[in-house]
Amino acid sequence: ISVCELYGKLREDKAYRRHPGSLYRVFVRLGFRKKPESTKKKSKHTGTYDTPTSIGEKWQMDVKYVPNACYSGKDGQKFYQYTVIEEASRKRFLYAYEEHSSFSTVDFLKRAILFFGYAPGILQTDNGGEFTHPSKTSRIHPLDVFCNRYRIRHKLIRPRTPWHNGKVERSHRNDQERFYNDLRFYSFSDLQTQMKRYLYRSNNIPMAVLGWKSPNQVQKDLSGR
């Protein structure tokens, strides 16, 4: 369990009101976590980014390869995690697939719209084949067909600039630490079940960038419900 997650549980269940930094220092003092030496390099990407303040303005979508080490099967099957993040609240939807393809992408977007209860104004993705065709072809990608039908603007980031999809990229790093590092599953349906539980958990973890509220809390505040 992370300090952020513990902080959220203490605040909700025990009315804890001290700053999360105090809780982190207690963790370090008790030896549960060592203070890492600073290895952070200055970012080369200093441009500003305007995060939407209203839900439904913009989603980021990406796909993550599920590590082989998590799967106890012997058939060599591969699995993929599709992710969409609501930029304004950081609330996410995840779903597992056995392939990353245009079919999986469109199916996932349909499921995401049902999960959130609305479609985004803008859907931002990278230039992977599951999201777009090469620029040299005149064919229309199935994702673009779907987006055009529902008046969603499909925005592609520039090639080799993953930081432009930074929110969903960072969330995948958190998934590795909080979920995949300790995950063991024996079948595709088992992966789906465990991922569903993890999705509920992750959307309830407070985040510093959200003023120590969880994505679910911010989503509720912004939707007025």
Predicted segments with their positions:
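Basic, flexible linker segments flanking DNA-binding modules
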Residues: 1-59, 63-66, 141, 218-223
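Mobile genetic element proteins and their domesticated derivatives, centered on retroelements
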Residues: 6, 23, 62, 84, ...
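Active-site beta-loop-alpha junctions of metal-dependent nucleic acid enzymes
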Residues: 77-78, 94-118, 122
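Acidic/histidine-rich, metal-coordinating catalytic segments
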Residues: 100, 118-135, 158-160, 212-215
